[in-house]
Amino acid sequence: MSDPLVLIPARLAATRLPNKPLADIAGEAMIVHVWRRAVEAGIGPVVVATDTAEIARTVEAAGGLAVMTRADHPSGSDRLAEALEIVDPEGRHDVVVNVQGDLPTIDPAIIGAAIVPLADRTVDIVTLCAPITDPHEADNPNVVKLVGHAVGPGRLRALYFTRARAPWGDGPLWHHIGLYAYRRTALSRFVALPPGELEVREKLEQLRALEAGMRIDAAIVDDLPLGVDTPADLERARALLQGRRLN
């Protein structure tokens, strides 16, 4: 692992919260807050990948770098792969970190945590998880659960991802956080694969990698970043970031 690249896919076509990346939070667009958190992680260059000129202009006005991608990508991973080839056609970056564009309050430290397990050459992809502490989350299908076993301090090997409560019995349940660090070769392989049977059934793209025999490990973090999906989430993010600004 030599020189990671951080990519933030962003597009306007959100159903529950229209124009989400451009929503104002404490005087700046949400996508700018995400870009700033990724820069603060200090692991490598940060680029926003978008199919919307207004998003690109907003990021660039804040001092960031954005690239335009096609509008017809079936998934964020495909957008990621196109952006990687635009930004780094020479292949200098051998790791790409995918930070979702709706995490304006994310702790930069957990972005950095995602690349650590890639020191193990048998790992293809790394993601994050946090312990489920709210019993209502265990049965909530909107909370994706990671099923895995420990392979070291603060690290799990993912065996499955599901919207159901799993695994059964006593023990921790893990809330999956949709941030990924890919080896470049793994990302290329992943986007070339057809959708998997379990991926389609659970509506979870990461299952495609497991079905194909790729290894996904997860770094355990203490806190869940706030994902902004609804107007209520947006108000929570505004309160949090306005409070930080006042402090």
From Swiss-Prot:
Pathway: Nucleotide-sugar biosynthesis; CMP-3-deoxy-D-manno-octulosonate biosynthesis; CMP-3-deoxy-D-manno-octulosonate from 3-deoxy-D-manno-octulosonate and CTP: step 1/1; Bacterial outer membrane biogenesis; lipopolysaccharide biosynthesis. It is found in: Cytoplasm. The keyword Nucleotidyltransferase applies. Gene3D superfamilies: Spore Coat Polysaccharide Biosynthesis Protein SpsA, Chain A. Its main location: cytoplasm. It is an enzyme of class 2 (transferase). Its EC number is 2.7.7.38. Activates KDO (a required 8-carbon sugar) for incorporation into bacterial lipopolysaccharide in Gram-negative bacteria. This is 3-deoxy-manno-octulosonate cytidylyltransferase. It comes from Methylobacterium radiotolerans (strain ATCC 27329 / DSM 1819 / JCM 2831 / NBRC 15690 / NCIMB 10815 / 0-1). The gene is kdsB.
